[in-house]
């Protein structure tokens, strides 16, 4: 198979990934592959572009390194072209409502007829099967959080709140990426492809496991946090200093001992309530939990963030300033690791945003291209799979494909 023109880089060089989906979850999976060196083809509707394009800046991050194909994959010759593309594809990712592809005639079995080794990842809110009440429903970030038990655990004591920005989309996208790579490993070993059913609510159910396990195995439900503090443990969470906010985790025997000396509670060490070897202070079960919070709040409020960071570093207490977005790119750690970078958009502008992560030492990822325009690579992709200029123009004339204007 000849690949589309692009530099060779990263651990996934030579891999062809195709995705069909809008907004965040499914495309995020595809973009991870693209930043790690895979050739990634983004399928968009012919009549209207991905709704993410209406955003002024985010698409330049979320659709960089992609090849844009505008094709009606469910109708006539457009479907034929899509199935032809599948013959040279390693991984196909689709994000839709339940078994939408199967309902429109593109089943796993049809895809495997054209490519027995194909890895197929289906990403939806409620999965490919289940009850009719849920399976075919639309879902976004907040829907998956609400249905999974994740949302009810977040927020403040007075009200649950979803975790933003779009947590369920990103977790689900990364799940699709990792699951597809696991399936690809097996497919290359056996010659037999795989179909993966990723339900966003199940992803969030798994991510929300920490406290839910206590309920499933004893009926205890963790309360929501208060003012950003850990619902269980004193000295953990968000705290106010004299000049701003920090987060901290008071965990460990020596950390508690030394911190208690600083905040005036050394006399509690070795008591029945806080015996020697205590590694965490339970804010509910320990009768001194509220007192620890009171003393810690007072001590932190009397010190600047810089003073707290310096002292906590000496005590090996995990702590960080809550950075504002304007502070990020000048932070020395960000600068040293080039966590924020710049790249050129297709119209020649400079765009700034997060760099590629994680950092591969021997086969690093790279940004080689900005977000392509709607249908920008349609002709090149169709030529790559054997279509002539006349074939492409016929698809365009029938409204089954769109090429760049």
Swiss-Prot record:
One Gene Ontology MF term: L-carnitine CoA-transferase activity
Subcellular location, record wording: Cytoplasm
Keyword hit for Transferase: yes
Catalysed reaction, written as an equation: crotonobetainyl-CoA + (R)-carnitine = crotonobetaine + (R)-carnitinyl-CoA; 4-(trimethylamino)butanoyl-CoA + (R)-carnitine = (R)-carnitinyl-CoA + 4-(trimethylamino)butanoate
Oligomeric form and interacting partners: Homodimer.
Function: Catalyzes the reversible transfer of the CoA moiety from gamma-butyrobetainyl-CoA to L-carnitine to generate L-carnitinyl-CoA and gamma-butyrobetaine. Is also able to catalyze the reversible transfer of the CoA moiety from gamma-butyrobetainyl-CoA or L-carnitinyl-CoA to crotonobetaine to generate crotonobetainyl-CoA.
Family to which this protein belongs: Belongs to the CoA-transferase III family. CaiB subfamily.
Protein name: L-carnitine CoA-transferase
Species, as recorded: Escherichia coli O157:H7
Gene name in the database record: caiB
């Amino acid at each position: 198979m000849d690949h589309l023109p692009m530099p060779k880089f990263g651990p996934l060089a030579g891999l062809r990934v195709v995705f069909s989906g809008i907004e965040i979850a499914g495309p995020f999976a595809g973009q991870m592959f693209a930043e790690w060196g895979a050739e990634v083809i983004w399928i968009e509707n012919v009549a209207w572009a991905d709704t993410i394009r209406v955003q002024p800046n985010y698409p330049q991050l979320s659709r960089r390194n992609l090849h844009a194909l505008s094709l009606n994959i469910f109708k006539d010759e457009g479907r034929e072209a899509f199935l032809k593309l599948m013959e040279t594809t390693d991984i196909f990712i689709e994000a839709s409502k339940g078994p939408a592809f199967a309902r429109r005639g593109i089943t796993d079995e049809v895809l495997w007829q054209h490519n027995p080794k194909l890895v197929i990842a289906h990403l939806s809110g409620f999965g490919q099967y289940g009850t009719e009440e849920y399976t075919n429903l639309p879902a976004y970030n907040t829907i998956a959080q609400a249905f999974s038990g994740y949302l009810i655990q977040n927020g403040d004591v007075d009200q649950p709140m979803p975790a933003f920005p779009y947590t369920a989309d990103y977790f689900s996208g990364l799940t699709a990426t990792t699951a597809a790579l696991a399936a690809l490993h097996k497919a290359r070993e056996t010659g037999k492809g795989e179909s993966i059913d990723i339900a966003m609510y199940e992803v969030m159910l798994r991510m929300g496991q920490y406290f839910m396990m206590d309920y499933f195995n004893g009926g205890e439900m963790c309360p929501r946090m208060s003012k950003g503090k850990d619902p269980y443990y004193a000295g953990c969470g968000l705290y106010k200093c004299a000049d701003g906010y920090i987060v901290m985790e008071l965990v460990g025997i020596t950390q508690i001992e030394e911190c208690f000396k600083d905040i005036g509670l050394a006399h509690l060490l070795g008591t029945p309530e806080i015996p020697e070897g205590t590694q965490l202070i339970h804010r509910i079960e320990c009768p001194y939990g509220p007192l620890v919070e009171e003393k810690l709040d007072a001590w932190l409020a009397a010190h600047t963030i810089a003073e707290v960071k310096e002292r906590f570093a000496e005590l090996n207490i995990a702590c960080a300033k809550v950075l504002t977005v304007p502070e990020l790119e000048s932070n020395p750690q960000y600068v040293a690791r080039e966590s924020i970078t710049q790249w050129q958009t297709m119209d020649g502008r400079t765009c700034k945003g997060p760099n590629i992560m994680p950092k591969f030492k021997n086969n690093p990822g790279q940004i080689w291209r900005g977000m392509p325009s709607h249908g920008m690579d349609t002709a090149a992709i169709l030529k790559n799979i054997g279509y002539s200029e006349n074939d492409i123009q016929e698809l365009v004339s029938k409204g089954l494909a769109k090429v760049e204007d």
